[in-house]
Amino acid sequence: MAASVPPGGQRILQKRRQAQSIKEKQAKQTPTSTRQAGYGGSSSSILKLYTDEANGFRVDSLVVLFLSVGFIFSVIALHLLTKFTHII
């Protein structure tokens, strides 16, 4: 009878080390941000409107608040108007 080799051993350890090194290499090669991956687009985007260096459109936060609340009230008013006009 031939002596059987126990499970595991040097070949398994070598395969595990090789798989671990492949994973480490892939982790080092993948970009960590979307800008590095090429998904960021150009740097002259809509975010330039909100930077201090931009010559873009500047709106005070209070104006944005009033406009958004006014929009919400107009939508509610239109819903109520259509609800009451369909009853009559």
Curated annotation (Swiss-Prot):
Give the region (Disordered) as residue ranges.
1-42
| UniProt-annotated location(s) | Endoplasmic reticulum membrane
Known InterPro entries for this protein?
Sec61-beta/Sbh (IPR030671), SecG/Sec61-beta/Sbh (IPR016482)
Q: Where is the composition biased (Polar residues)?
A: 28-42
Q: How does it sit in the membrane?
A: Single-pass membrane protein
What stretch or stretches form a coiled coil here?
none
Instruction: Write down what this protein is called.
Output: Protein transport protein SBH2
Q: Which organism is it from?
A: Saccharomyces cerevisiae (strain ATCC 204508 / S288c)
